[in-house]
Amino acid sequence: MELQKGKGTVAAAASGAAGGGGGGAGAGAPGGGRLLLSTSLDAKDELEERLERCMSIVTSMTAGVSEREANDALNAYVCKGPPQHEEICLGLFTLVLTEPAQAQKCYRDLALVSRDGMNIVLNKINQLLMEKYLKLQDTCRTQLVWLVRELVKSGVLGADGVCMTFMKQIAGGDVTAKNIWLAESVLDILTEQREWVLKSSILIAMAVYTYLRLIVDHHGTAQLQTLRQKEVDFCISLLRERFMECLMIGRDLVRLLQNVARIPEFELLWKDIIHNPQALSPQFTGILQLLQSRTSRKFLACRLTPDMETKLLFMTSRVRFGQQKRYQDWFQRQYLSTPDSQSLRCDLIRYICGVVHPSNEVLSSDILPRWAIIGWLLTTCTSNVAASNAKLALFYDWLFFSPEKDSIMNIEPAILVMHHSMKPHPAITATLLDFMCRIIPNFYPPLEGHVRQGVFSSLNHIVEKRVLAHLAPLFDNPKLDKELRSMLREKFPEFCSSPSPPVEVKIEEPVSMEMDNHLSDKDESCYDNAEAAFSDDEEDLNSKGKKREFRFHPIKETVVEEPVDVTPYLDQLDESLRDKVLQLQKGSDTEAQCEVMQEIVDQVLEEDFDSEQLSVLASCLQELFKAHFRGEVLPEEVTEESLEESVGKPLYLIFRNLCQMQEDNSSFSLLLDLLSELYQKQPKIGYHLLYYLRASKAAAGKMNLYESFAQATQLGDLHTCLMMDMKACQEDDVRLLCHLTPSIYTEFPDETLRSGELLNMIVAVIDSAQLQELVCHVMMGNLVMFRKDSVLNILIQSLDWETFEQYCAWQLFLAHNIPLETIIPILQHLKYKEHPEALSCLLLQLRREKPSEEMVKMVLSRPCHPDDQFTTSILRHWCMKHDELLAEHIKALLIKNNSLPRKRQSLRSSSSKLAQLTLEQILEHLDNLRLNLANTKQNFFSQTPILQALQHVQASCDEAHKMKFSDLFSLAEEYEDSSTKPPKSRRKAALSSPRSRKNATQPPNAEEESGSSSASEEEDTKPKPTKRKRKGSSAVGSDSD
């Protein structure tokens, strides 16, 4: 819903709310509850329900009584315990948001009853901002700003974090009224409470970074110019007075200052930065100091709203390469469709380069790579300025790259965009290479030597880390124009000559990374809906003696150990808990840490423990156990002793205590709450719990604890939680995934066997040895991965998987003792060109089976195609092994289908997705089989059931089909001649066609003739000589009996 107010009016509304009575921006928004917007189709939001429930508790206690009585009632209720304290705090908080007229009074009450320094309220504000802001009613948004202003005025500890979350919601490239209102409202708070702002270094840096970026968007109208001037004044004052705090931003501060350099105030600042750096701070030595400092991820992430960040992370972790178009289209419609949104592309590219660093498993999978998203962003730039800024954002970490300080992951996207664009989008590659060459002398001439060295170091590191095996194919490519190639040779002669002899890219190279999944020449759209494919000329390259370049080898990037820092959380902990956390931090050996961890758990379980500290404690533990979450979980050699030793880590003490408790115990709930808080901050905790329950003797038979854990998390759902944890495990440790698989399938059959989600996760990453291990588990009865009621659906789902994944799924299915008839209907879904994996697996399994009528029906239901040999292959095999049984089944099917569909029926059946068995199909397959058996001694078509069925079909089908299948029906003619002699006129009619006469006088082979005569003798002994004279339909009926 758009705001219907101008900038000044909105600001006035915000200031009105500050008095406790402001109506807010767009108060009375239609639809939804009092807090969130919704439609009649949306389910009621759980958070909103809880807040409204708490509000009704407060209202019921304070309605109709004096202010003093209300205060007494609230205080008495709060004293009952932590849950009651939380209810009152959240109730008053909700009243502040939904009742502007009562806001001042409710805030005063909140300040009086809060026992945790407003921690509950701060956490809830953060949750609303991160998860629900886009759905918040406008009144609530305005009141939220008012409440934050009051918290800041009161100097509440942690309010700076809420301000930073608020700033994150201000979208770049968006000048809609709501966004401008939010930018101005937060700026007003920061300006009014300047002394408070100056107490927090991180808030200073974050505010400067945010508003420096927003200044670029705010131009044009008088209202925007006024806001822009306020932003300029704010940033300049902080930069001049607190430059060293701003220095923590790193090199991206220079990039943002470049974008605003022509504004007079920043022009003066630039002069000081370049010519008089000491004027800003005695510790500031000059611009090179800034440029050589890498920008922290938190700054790059703060310029994307939570929704943008979620969508971008989803694309880079869940969407398969080739299936990204609809997600990109949605993102473009939502965020990149206006002229003002051009500036947002830089934020997105910096975020992708600096924050999105996928794991090796993701890098080596078919998940949409970072370079493809960046390529798409570059191709959608419509402004020259935006395109130049986007290219600078992409190469920014190259300019002063230092292998010791910077990450390969920051520079990898640029080289891969150029590499992969060469075939489908050579213009993109050319413009990026040109930019790379020209930025060296033009970025800042006095530092040209440093920039040259930075770019050279980047290219050198790229080759060393095997991101590309060598750069000559890129720099000296005939698709580039001569001038550009000449400039590249001049600037980078070291990288322009091919190595001799050719460098072999060995697959076992641990740091090799060769993403040569080029797109075919036919495909011109690798940044939208392209399928990943190798280039058409790859075979030619191989034939010329060059080593085939492998699709990808993940980078083994050296993990830079960041120092553990729990300082921000210590002040929020009780003194005794704080001491224990510090002991845990200082503990040098595992045993000492375990003792301290047990003391922490014991303190958490004490009756007077403040449960509001769980969140802070979880943040500390998450920080302290970073190395544990990064390290190997499963021991190299799996024995009982090594498993028991592996679960002796401090973190696992929480799990051990949980296993020793009764589930209805309040201590049990408290530990689950602690784990839930930990899970929010470190999702890996989920699969660590699964491992502990699987590996520890103390946890034997306690796997159901995981279900309690899942329900205690914010997800609140076992299936979702389990799948997310197994996905996290798959991305981190494939060995552990395989180790957990048997127990996960055994303990949670309803969650694992009903769909192919977990199976796909497993087969996507296992190798052949791990597959064989799982097959053994199945055959020994330790593992069940399929059950009869869902196996068919799972195998149908698997048809979209990669080839090796499908083969794995079939191998695992065949290890189970499930009758093949259960899955035979899958044949109706299989197309010979699209599903060769499933067809070959099914064919090999069918040859081991005795044919049933249902099997034969499904096999014959396949459409006839000259290149599809599936039906003929299996029918021929059954002819050799089970000829009599097959003949009976075919006879029965021919008789049942002995009526060609009418036109109306065929139209109806053709609209069905699944193939319907028709008489013509059966005859076509039989004719193909007849031709295949023509030169063999097999006498399948001389069997009585087949000949009888063909007789009856011939008697009732039309002339067109008699002609089409004349050779097939001729077999029945011979059987008819030898069994009964029909009237002359009938005989003449039967022999009237030349093909019939030829076949009548010259039988195909001796075996068929002898088979035919023996069949006749058999028929003569039965008292049924008059059947042949009846009408076809009655004959069919009696013969069927």
Curated annotation (Swiss-Prot):
N-acetylmethionine found at: M1
Gene Ontology CC entries for this record: cytoplasm; INTAC complex; integrator complex; nucleus; site of double-strand break; SOSS complex
Superkingdom: Eukaryota
GO BP, sorted A to Z: DNA damage response; DNA repair; double-strand break repair via homologous recombination; mitotic G2/M transition checkpoint; response to ionizing radiation; RNA polymerase II transcription initiation surveillance; snRNA processing
Phosphoserine modifications at: S500, S535, S993
This protein's record includes keyword Plastid: no
Amino acid composition bias (Acidic residues), ranges on this chain: 1006-1020
Region Disordered, annotated ranges: 975-1041
Location in or out of the cell: Nucleus; Cytoplasm
Broad class of the protein's primary localization: nucleus
Record's keyword terms, sorted: Acetylation, Cytoplasm, DNA damage, DNA repair, Nucleus, Phosphoprotein
Alphabetized PANTHER family for the sequence: INTEGRATOR COMPLEX SUBUNIT 3
Assembly information from the UniProt record: Component of the Integrator complex, composed of core subunits INTS1, INTS2, INTS3, INTS4, INTS5, INTS6, INTS7, INTS8, INTS9/RC74, INTS10, INTS11/CPSF3L, INTS12, INTS13, INTS14 and INTS15. The core complex associates with protein phosphatase 2A subunits PPP2CA and PPP2R1A, to form the Integrator-PP2A (INTAC) complex. Component of the SOSS complex, composed of SOSS-B (SOSS-B1/NABP2 or SOSS-B2/NABP1), SOSS-A/INTS3 and SOSS-C/INIP. SOSS complexes containing SOSS-B1/NABP2 are more abundant than complexes containing SOSS-B2/NABP1.
Family as reported in the entry's similarity comment: Belongs to the Integrator subunit 3 family.
Function recorded in the entry: Component of the integrator complex, a multiprotein complex that terminates RNA polymerase II (Pol II) transcription in the promoter-proximal region of genes. Component of the SOSS complex, a multiprotein complex that functions downstream of the MRN complex to promote DNA repair and G2/M checkpoint. The SOSS complex associates with single-stranded DNA at DNA lesions and influences diverse endpoints in the cellular DNA damage response including cell-cycle checkpoint activation, recombinational repair and maintenance of genomic stability. The SOSS complex is required for efficient homologous recombination-dependent repair of double-strand breaks (DSBs) and ATM-dependent signaling pathways.
Protein's name according to its UniProt entry: Integrator complex subunit 3
Species in which this protein is naturally found: Mus musculus (Mouse)
